[in-house]
Amino acid sequence: MRLPMLTGEVGGSGEVDLEQVSKMVDLFLDNGFTYFDTAHGYISGSSETAMRECLVKRHPRDSFTLTDKLTGNYWQKQEDIRPLFEKQLEACGVTYFDYYLMHALTNELYDRYKSSHAFEEVLALKKEGKIRHMGISFHDKAYVLDRILKEQPEIEYVQIQYNYRDITDSGVERDKVYDVCVKYNKPVIVMEPCKGGALADRLPDQAKGILNALHGGSPASYAIRFAASQPQVFMVLSGMSTLEQAQDNISYMKDFKPL
């Protein structure tokens, strides 16, 4: 979710619309979906506390799965990681995270995580039961991901950018990155399936006309279903920010049929 806001812009800073978030959370859970994603830096920390108020305080812990992330901006050395992690648990109001990611890894950032023994620290937290599954989110070339997965076999899953527009973007290396995940048999979470909304509400008129003529759903539905149809993918983050978008997502993902 890109949380709805009372002030500021969606995806930026400001005051979160907690009433609207609660309605979206309830609708999402009522229809059998469970996965919620946050990070310490999202909305200057308000994303984590919104999860606490709208999700954790209002629903049984075993009714949802919650993801948080170790973001490089908030720690400098290994000794900083555990206090940051405990702060994240407190902000979210939970005693463990179902999923925890090394956030936005690039070649340069991976070297820092590796030299600072961040992987060892997060693995220790997992052994203590405070993390159920450890993964990474990734923003670099395929050869970098290959190196990371070879050197860190304890990684359980990988979050990557994957959408139908990026097939022509050599900077993203969409298919090569995906193929590395397949090579190492790592389940994939997709981020940016709608490329920041470009494949949802900002399509060129000609492309929008082609999709509308198919009468098979909204433009966003094609983008999200395209990502969800890939065999290695087990989760797609849709970035919905309104109740209407949540209802649209549910309409084609509740009884999902691959494209």
Regions found by a protein language model. Name each.
Residues 1-19, 69-80, 108-111, 205-217:
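Active-site mouth loops of central-metabolism enzymes
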Residues 1-64, 121, 127:
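N-terminal binding-site loop/beta-alpha segment at the start of enzyme catalytic domains
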Residues 13-28, 76-93, 140-150, 219-226:
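Short, acidic/polar
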Residues 26-29, 33-34, 53, 150-153, ...:
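Structured C-terminal cap/extension of enzyme domains
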Residues 29-30, 52-63, 86-95, 126, ...:
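Acidic (Asp/Glu)-rich catalytic clusters
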Residues 34-35, 63-69, 96-101, 130-135, ...:
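Structural preference for beta-strand elements that scaffold enzyme active sites
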Residues 46-57, 78-89, 109-120, 140-153:
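Distinct, well-ordered alpha-helical segments
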Residues 89-110:
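Active-site groove signature of glycoside hydrolases
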